């Protein structure tokens, strides 16, 4: 008998202070890759009040104005209103950058070095990464995080278009879905907190967002008289963004991935070039898992990788289909090894990652986005046929 339970996931909009920092970090990364595809970038950002600090390690031939890129990132989010202390044109920017450590560089470069196990390009660090896919939604993502992102994306559209003039950039969404086994059947609760101007009343915020946002995004058949709507439950959200909370790059890793339903290795994505397996191997894991599900070989699939710094081969690769596999799991794992290559250099090549594509990934999830498959290559299902053939 299938078990009924509720699973919740949250998302944040691009105006959330942590996402402001993720956006800045990925703007800096793309600025490097635009001029030098072989740039090595690890860029962190902190935002508080009307101050932004960027720091990290960059080895690149790219030349650009860091401060201008920071302001451009903030402007794209929409922090240009006079009623917000944090502002693209007036914020103070502090930059503290150095080059990548020579010790790390020799491990990652495609060269021989004393004490290095191989001359091939190695992983940029040790660590473990996960990829996940399931058949709950057309984009093969878990329903709670998928709809939390869709609410956030539409909320931002309503703000930027001017359709709801009292909206401001900072917001969070949370969706609780009731399941019967692995099948989502109804929405138990929607939580939405959005920054707003001081002159709008709570009653208008609640009514507007339920009618114009939630009911237009969530499947009507999943909403019922028992669905709970918690809209700005503190009663006021005027102070937001970095004015209200300090933001730091890399603090929304569960929002960025699978909303807690698929596991996470702990490494953040934003501000890191693809030699960092925290990012590139996580993208690879999604590509593998999505193609397994798209091929009909499982209803759910999770892939785990582990790497050692400077080493070209993964230490381990494992596959779990949660008892939903249509073929023997050992056979599936062999097929995955035959179809995909997990060396860091090959991941970069297969997914075409040495391009300035990363600011497209920053907000509303790095996975489940099918609006730009040319950039987000890990969302393609172009290996499903090869996998089916490999297990035949």
Q: Which residues fall in each region the model found?
A:
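N-terminal, positively charged regions that mediate nucleic acid binding
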Residues: 1-42, 48, 379
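Glycine-rich, mobile lid/loop segments that gate access to catalytic sites or pores
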Residues: 8, 68, 75-239, 363, ...
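Conserved phosphate/anionic-ligand binding catalytic regions in large, soluble enzymes, centered on
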Residues: 10-12, 16-21, 121-137, 238-263, ...
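Alpha-helical support elements that line or immediately flank enzyme active sites
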Residues: 14-33, 136-153, 272-296
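A short glycine-rich, hydrophobically flanked beta-strand micro-motif that places a catalytic Asp/Glu
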Residues: 39-43, 171-177, 227-231, 297-308
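Short, charge-patterned binding micro-sites
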Residues: 41-60, 309-313
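Internal helix-turn-beta structural module
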Residues: 48, 300, 308-392
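Glycine-rich anion/phosphate-binding loop at the beta-strand->alpha-helix junction
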Residues: 200-294
């Amino acid at each position: 008998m299938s078990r009924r339970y509720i699973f919740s996931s949250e998302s944040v909009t691009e105006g959330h202070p942590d996402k402001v920092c993720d956006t800045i970090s990925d703007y800096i990364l793309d600025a490097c890759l635009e001029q030098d595809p072989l740039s090595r970038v690890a860029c962190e950002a902190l935002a508080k009040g009307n101050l932004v600090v960027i720091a990290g390690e960059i080895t690149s031939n790219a030349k650009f104005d860091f401060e201008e890129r920071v302001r451009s990132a903030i402007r794209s989010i929409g922090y240009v209103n006079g009623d917000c202390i944090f502002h693209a044109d007036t914020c103070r920017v502090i930059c503290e950058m150095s080059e990548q450590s020579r010790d790390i560089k020799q491990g990652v470069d495609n060269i021989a070095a004393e004490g290095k196990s191989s001359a091939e390009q190695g992983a940029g660090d040790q660590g473990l990464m996960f990829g996940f896919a399931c058949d709950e939604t057309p984009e093969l993502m878990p329903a709670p995080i998928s709809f939390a992102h869709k609410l956030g994306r539409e909320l931002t559209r309503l703000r930027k278009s001017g359709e709801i003039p009292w909206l401001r950039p900072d917001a969070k969404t949370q969706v609780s879905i009731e399941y019967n086994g692995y099948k989502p059947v109804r929405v138990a609760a929607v939580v939405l907190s959005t920054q707003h101007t001081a002159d709008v009343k709570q009653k208008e915020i609640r009514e507007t967002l339920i009618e114009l946002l939630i009911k237009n995004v969530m499947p009507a058949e999943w909403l019922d008289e028992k669905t709970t709507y918690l809209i700005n439950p503190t009663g006021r959200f005027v102070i937001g963004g970095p004015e209200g909370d300090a933001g730091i790059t890399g603090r929304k890793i569960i929002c960025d991935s699978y909303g807690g339903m698929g596991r996470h290795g702990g490494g953040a994505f934003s501000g890191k070039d693809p030699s960092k397996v925290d990012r590139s191997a996580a993208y690879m894991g999604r590509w593998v898992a999505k193609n397994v599900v798209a091929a009909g070989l499982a209803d759910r699939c999770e892939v785990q990788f582990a790497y050692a710094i400077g080493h070209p081969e993964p230490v381990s690769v494992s596959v779990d289909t949660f008892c939903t596999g249509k073929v023997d799991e050992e056979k599936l794992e062999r097929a995955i090894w035959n179809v995909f290559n997990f060396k860091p250099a090959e991941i970069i090549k297969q997914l075409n990652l040495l391009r300035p594509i990363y600011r497209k990934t920053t907000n509303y999830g790095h996975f489940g986005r099918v609006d730009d498959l040319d950039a987000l290559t890990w969302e393609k299902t172009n290996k499903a046929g090869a996998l089916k053939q490999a297990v035949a």
